[in-house]
Regions:
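Short, hinge-like loop/turn segments at secondary-structure boundaries
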Residues: 50-54, 105-107, 129-130
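Small/aliphatic-rich secondary-structure junction motif
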Residues: 3-55, 84-87, 134
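A short acidic, glycine-rich active-site loop
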Residues: 54-70
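Glycine-rich, Arg-bearing micro-motifs that act as flexible, cationic patches
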Residues: 110-134
Length: 143
């Protein structure tokens, strides 16, 4: 049923729970696990810093990419150690649009996303809700 499972992964506790669930799902199905991490734009104050020192923005972005690549490598190792075939991709853009584009491009059969347990007040504006509104594949929300 599910041949390609994609998990949205970042530095959050919720993403760690989503990764664990995605690994558990992928293993018995022998599904390919794709770990996607979105590289979002830097905060606006970097634009001001760029006026004074243009390399500052590029250096900060590269440091962010490097940190996220290291995070992904750790996730791939964790999946591989569990016997799951896994790859990782970094995508640029907004959180929602990046996840949706990656799921379409990689032909994901299932998308797994973590969601805070105590995040009910703004649930209608959550990343999970917005991704659900824009993706064509089934979505599993992990608390």
């Amino acid at each position: 049923m599910f041949h390609t499972i994609m998990v949205a992964y970042d530095e959050s506790r919720e993403a760690a729970h989503a990764l664990a669930s995605a690994i558990e799902l992928a293993k018995p199905l022998r599904a390919h696990l794709i770990i996607v991490t979105v590289v979002e734009a830097l905060p606006a104050f970097y634009n001001i810093a760029a006026i004074v020192s243009p390399p500052v923005v590029e250096e900060a972005l590269e440091e962010k990419r490097s940190r996220l690549r290291t995070l992904q490598q750790s996730a791939v190792k964790r999946a591989t150690a569990a016997g799951v075939n896994a790859d990782a991709i970094l995508v640029d853009g907004g959180e929602v649009s990046g996840i949706v584009r990656a799921a379409q491009r990689e032909h994901a059969d299932l998308l797994v996303i973590g969601h805070p347990k105590h995040y009910r007040l703004g649930a209608f504006n959550s990343t999970v809700r917005n991704v659900a509104d824009h993706t064509r594949c089934p979505l599993l929300e992990v608390n």
